[in-house]
């Protein structure tokens, strides 16, 4: 099994300050504990929240900071009490690497809502050391926060599912939209939004993409399989679509008015916020009162849901649309992501970047 009691060094790319620029960084991994697995990172997706983290947009970043929470790799070492994985398994690691295990959410297997959850980067682990993410050649993770990638699923395709995929799957599951026959809207067609379209279609929904421009109309309808496309500034079309949707998954990660989209919902419809926004959102109360509509939110998903989501995507043939880059391109990728210049998810080929050479 290797030397479990020896700390190992890892090489990643870290931000040092709110400029958000990443550069090579060597740091120490904790020793592989009894319930830990050491993972050699193969691929890691780039999420918009990584931008928030490295640029300290939320005012909580601690540097040096290695981002990356859509991690797929190979198990290279297991602790003595590990029962879920063996050396050689292809596995995934998402946004969480720990929780208290004792609170109400943990006992209900929705540990993403634990008040003592531990983020996979920009947090402090139980040993007092900072956690670092997947833009690195190796990680050590508690087996309870690792999932097995289904056999036959390409690792680079699996990476975005560990955040973008589960972030849309979980609200479908929780709010009862995991059956066919619903009419839904996906607001925003970025990395998360494109997974929303694909998963909703795989569940048998009629899907309308809502965007601020016509730029992605052809892509949405012809390649992603959406049924309709609405431009939010087209007043006539928006009025025609009023009261037509059971739900809207709002993926937009910047401030925007809500009333325009509330008008699209049927009675008892739900506007589900999943974009991380650091400015207040506003609406007038009659917009929800007069249709018994709800504005709610959802945050990633549980480990159990993540396993279900991976199996669902494998069964239905749901894949992510990605652009694979090497680590030395990461700063350019961050700039492009900030400008929405990606179709639809950057995935870093970490192993192919040969960080240790």
From Swiss-Prot:
Belongs to the zinc-containing alcohol dehydrogenase family. The keyword Ribonucleoprotein does not apply. Its cofactor is Zn(2+). Binds 2 Zn(2+) ions per subunit. It catalyses: (E)-cinnamyl alcohol + NADP(+) = (E)-cinnamaldehyde + NADPH + H(+); (E)-coniferol + NADP(+) = (E)-coniferaldehyde + NADPH + H(+); (E)-sinapyl alcohol + NADP(+) = (E)-sinapaldehyde + NADPH + H(+); (E)-4-coumaroyl alcohol + NADP(+) = (E)-4-coumaraldehyde + NADPH + H(+). Keywords: Lignin biosynthesis, Metal-binding, NADP, Oxidoreductase, Zinc. Zn(2+) 2 binds at residues 100, 103, 106, 114. The N-terminus is blocked. GO terms for biological process: alkaloid metabolic process; lignin biosynthetic process. Homodimer. It comes from Nicotiana tabacum (Common tobacco). Disulfide bonds: none annotated. Pathway: Aromatic compound metabolism; phenylpropanoid biosynthesis. One of its GO terms (molecular function) is cinnamyl-alcohol dehydrogenase activity. InterPro entries: ADH-like_C, ADH-like_N, ADH_Zn_CS, CAD-like, GroES-like_sf, NAD(P)-bd_dom_sf, PKS_ER. Induction: By fungal elicitor. NADP(+) binds at residues 49, 167, 188-193, 211-216, 251, 275, 298-300. This is Probable cinnamyl alcohol dehydrogenase 2. Zn(2+) 1 binds at residues 47, 69-70, 163. Involved in lignin biosynthesis. Catalyzes the final step specific for the production of lignin monomers. Catalyzes the NADPH-dependent reduction of coniferaldehyde, 5-hydroxyconiferaldehyde, sinapaldehyde, 4-coumaraldehyde and caffeyl aldehyde to their respective alcohols. Its EC number is 1.1.1.195.
């Amino acid at each position: 099994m290797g030397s479990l009691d020896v700390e190992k060094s890892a090489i990643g790319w870290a931000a040092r300050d709110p400029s958000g620029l990443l550069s090579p960084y060597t740091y120490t991994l904790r020793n592989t504990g009894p319930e830990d697995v050491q993972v050699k990172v193969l691929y890691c997706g780039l999420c918009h929240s990584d931008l928030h983290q490295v640029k300290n947009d939320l005012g909580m970043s601690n540097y040096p900071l290695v981002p990356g929470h859509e991690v797929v790799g190979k198990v290279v070492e297991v602790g003595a009490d590990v029962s879920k994985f063996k050396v050689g398994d292809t596995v995934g690691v998402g946004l969480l690497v720990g929780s208290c295990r004792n609170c109400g959410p943990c006992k209900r297997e929705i540990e993403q809502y634990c008040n003592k959850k531990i983020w996979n980067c920009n947090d402090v682990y139980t040993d007092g050391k900072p956690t670092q993410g997947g833009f690195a050649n190796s990680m050590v993770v508690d087996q309870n926060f690792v999932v097995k990638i289904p056999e036959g699923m390409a690792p680079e395709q699996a990476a975005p599912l560990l955040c973008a995929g589960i972030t849309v799957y979980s609200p479908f599951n929780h709010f009862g939209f995991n059956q066919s026959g619903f009419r839904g809207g996906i607001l925003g067609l970025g990395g998360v939004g494109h997974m929303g379209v694909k998963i909703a279609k795989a569940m048998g929904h009629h899907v309308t993409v809502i965007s601020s421009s016509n730029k992605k109309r052809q892509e949405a309808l012809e390649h992603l399989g959406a049924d309709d496309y609405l431009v939010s500034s087209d007043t006539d079309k928006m009025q025609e679509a009023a009261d037509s949707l059971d739900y809207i998954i709002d993926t937009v990660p910047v401030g925007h008015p809500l009333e325009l989209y509330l008008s699209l919902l049927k009675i008892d419809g739900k506007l589900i916020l999943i974009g991380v926004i650091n400015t207040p959102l506003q609406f007038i109360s009659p917009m929800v009162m007069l249709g018994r509509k709800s504005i709610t939110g959802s945050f990633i998903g549980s480990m159990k849901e993540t396993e279900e989501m991976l199996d669902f995507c494998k069964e239905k043939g749901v894949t992510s649309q990605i652009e694979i880059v090497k680590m030395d391109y990461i700063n350019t990728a961050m700039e492009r992501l900030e400008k929405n210049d990606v179709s639809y998810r950057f995935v870093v080929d970490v192993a192919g970047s040969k960080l240790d050479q």
